[in-house]
């Protein structure tokens, strides 16, 4: 949470999103609205492109829903909405899908970027492939045969 807050603080202090370009952490910034169809993506860094396999031009202007799929936990997404509205921040894990529709477990922290009046201008999401962190390589979800 502290890293995400530090990045958001740099943006609030007037830094351009470009200060995040060379960051090794995967970062996505969306609009500040939470209403449907959801906040549109306004910035991603190279680490996020590598994580999800989508190039920046395909991500910008769409919503994070493009990374969700059949087995994405809808209850966790509902918790995300509730916590952002109630507390203005969120930490959790969820199953996402890369461009090839391969599953990966995403650990993410979402914090606000506020304007001078204190209103939420954007949401900054710091994202980690949880299985990669554990195994040291690109994590894949392995489902047991039934």
Where are these regions (language model features)?
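PAS-family sensory domains
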Residues: 32-34, 93, 95-101, 108-111, 114-115, 126
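PAS-family sensory/regulatory domains
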Residues: 60-71
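Terminal output helix/cap of sensory domains in signal transduction proteins
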Residues: 70-95, 100-102
């Amino acid at each position: 949470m502290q890293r995400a807050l530090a990045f958001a603080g740099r943006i609030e202090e007037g830094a351009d999103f470009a200060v995040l370009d060379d960051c090794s952490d995967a970062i996505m910034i969306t609009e500040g609205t939470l209403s449907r169809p959801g906040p549109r993506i306004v910035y991603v860094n190279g680490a996020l492109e590598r994580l999800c396999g989508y190039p920046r031009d395909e991500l910008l202007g769409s919503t994070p829903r493009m990374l969700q799929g059949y087995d994405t936990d809808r209850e966790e997404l509902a918790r995300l909405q509730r916590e952002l509205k109630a507390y203005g921040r969120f930490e959790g894990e969820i199953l996402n899908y890369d461009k090839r529709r391969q599953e990966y477990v995403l650990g993410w922290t979402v914090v606000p970027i506020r304007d001078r009046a204190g209103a939420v201008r954007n949401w900054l999401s710091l994202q980690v492939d949880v299985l990669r962190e554990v195994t040291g390589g690109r994590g894949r979800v392995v489902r047991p045969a039934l």
